[in-house]
Amino acid sequence: MPDSFAFLADKIFTGESWLTQHAVIIEEDKIKEVVPAASVPDDIEKKNYPGGILAPAFIDLQIYGAYGKLLAVYPEADSLYKLNDYCRSGGAVYCMPTVATNATEVFHQCIDAIRDYWNKGGEGVLGLHVEGPWINAVKKGAHIESFIHSPSLQEVKDLVNYGKEVIKIITLAPEVCSKEAIEYIIGQGIVVSAGHSNATYKQANTGFSYGIPMATHLYNAMSPLQHREPGLLGAVLDSDKVKASIIPDGHHADFAAVRIAKQVMKERLFVITDAVTETNSGYYQHLKVGDKYESMGILSGSALTMNKAVQNLVKYCNVEAGEALRMCSLYPAQVMNMDKSFGRIKTGYKADIVVLNENFDLIKII
């Protein structure tokens, strides 16, 4: 097998611009160069995808489980293999398994499951997204209220230390967590996201001043923008730095609301699927209703894949195709400080590339 391959398609989106009549030359697992198709050396094996689009592969920073295995209910490596398979079915080669508000022992079990998955050679899983329990019960959504509380600094340290190098994101409500707790988490290299929060505009901005760089699922489970109290939503929209995830499935937010947020936030807005799976045991029991999930009648998760999110953004939200692709690749990579090696088709970057058709259906992951 040759060491290098040239991949050709009708269009290439590099993460920065669109190219036609070009090829991506890959050597081992890195992008060697992007060149005009006519200049590909004859001794390099060519793989052509007529009618296809080459684009940076996607990354999903919030997904709870797949194929009947919710991680919080089945905290084991098999759940992560299924979750990763689901992500790849929509073009996401990296994902952040997520556990909602729960007992400490469940968080520990999920941390252990990820370590076991990695030890077995499992790929794609970046770490754990801990969503709660340090949130505001007023904005609990489908979270279990009995576990929700304001943490002591010692509790924060204990969980973070147990999850060292595994916990990568923590969603919390800034108004229920101390400055010391927030700064400690950030100091351990974990991304803190404001979510499930009833913060006032002032409280939200105070949290941002402590270093909180983003918010979780914009619009959902957060204090809304009102003309006399702009809330967390208003603080995010008003910021020029704070990023936010959004779920473009048409259920978590109307497509017009997604479009408005995009017009205001531009490159600060990125996609998550927030995908769950059906389960009838444990604290979180999700029932699929159409193309969404509910728990006791409350919207509790999506049935999105990342490529479906791209389709929705382009079709319903008036987002340009390249920008929709960036929202699923480059921008989440930036959140995780991965954008020096992921999110672009560029010399030296990892060869994590999706092949899509003109409707953004997944053909292949390279």
Language-model regions: role of each:
Residues 235-244, 262-349, 353-356:
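His/Asp/Glu-enriched, well-ordered alpha-helical/loop segment
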Residues 130, 185, 215, 313, ...:
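Conserved, mostly hydrophobic/aromatic
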Residues 1-40, 365:
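N-terminal metal-binding scaffold of metallo-dependent hydrolase/deaminase domains
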Residues 65-77, 144-149, 191-195:
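Active-site mouth loops of central-metabolism enzymes
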Residues 64, 85-96, 136-164, 208-218, ...:
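Active-site gating loops and adjacent loop-to-helix segments of metal-dependent hydrolytic enzymes
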Residues 63-68, 81-110, 123-136, 163-175, ...:
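Divalent metal-dependent hydrolysis catalytic cores, especially in the metallo-beta-lactamase
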Residues 157-279:
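Active-site core of metal-dependent hydrolases
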